């Protein structure tokens, strides 16, 4: 990895690798979806969805940095994963009958570029509907990465235009407003 930048003003993360591959990602300001875009890919990239391990019985490190903090202690069943050639859906049962679903779908709009959207939806027992994150992702893909990025940026621009700060000491206030990227 060569560089990672989080643009606070636009809530966009960019990652640049030594190979020239560039990734942009954001969680939309007003839509319940997130986006990722990889550019300058020299080979096919297939996104991988790795769910939290809420259960025992798998190989490898469990990620427990603090004794007793492992998610395995929750004992939830493994997530059900459904893969297609351009999407993956995970359904996870949790405490009290909670069910959440993560859906990720992607496309290759041009050679060397991969764009994808994702969403998470949940339901509790008695909810009239099943969680359907795919119902959020499909229209997002229909709108496209660039269109959603523009509405996302517009929302953040309007938010910053309505924002202000006033500090009793004018020197830190000036430093706040003169920060790069603001």
Q: What are these language model-derived features?
A:
Residues 1-182:
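Acidic/polar, glycine-enriched structural segments that form the non-catalytic walls/loops
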């Amino acid at each position: 990895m060569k560089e990672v930048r989080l643009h606070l003003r636009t809530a966009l993360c960019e990652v640049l690798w030594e190979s020239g591959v560039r990734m942009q990602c954001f969680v939309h300001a007003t839509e319940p979806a997130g986006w990722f875009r990889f550019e300058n890919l020299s080979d096919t990239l297939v996104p991988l969805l790795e769910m939290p391990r809420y259960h025992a019985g798998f190989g490898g490190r469990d990620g427990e940095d603090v004794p007793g903090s492992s998610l395995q202690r929750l004992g939830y069943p493994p997530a059900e994963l459904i893969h297609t050639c351009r999407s993956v859906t995970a359904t996870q049962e949790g405490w009290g009958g909670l069910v959440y679903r993560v859906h990720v779908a992607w496309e290759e709009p041009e050679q060397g570029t991969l764009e994808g959207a994702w969403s998470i939806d949940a339901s509790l027992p008695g909810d009239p509907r099943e969680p359907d994150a795919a119902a959020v992702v499909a229209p997002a893909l229909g709108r496209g990465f660039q269109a959603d990025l523009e509405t996302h940026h517009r929302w953040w621009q309007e938010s910053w235009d309505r924002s202000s700060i006033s500090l009793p000491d004018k020197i830190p206030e000036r430093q706040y407003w003169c920060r790069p990227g603001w």
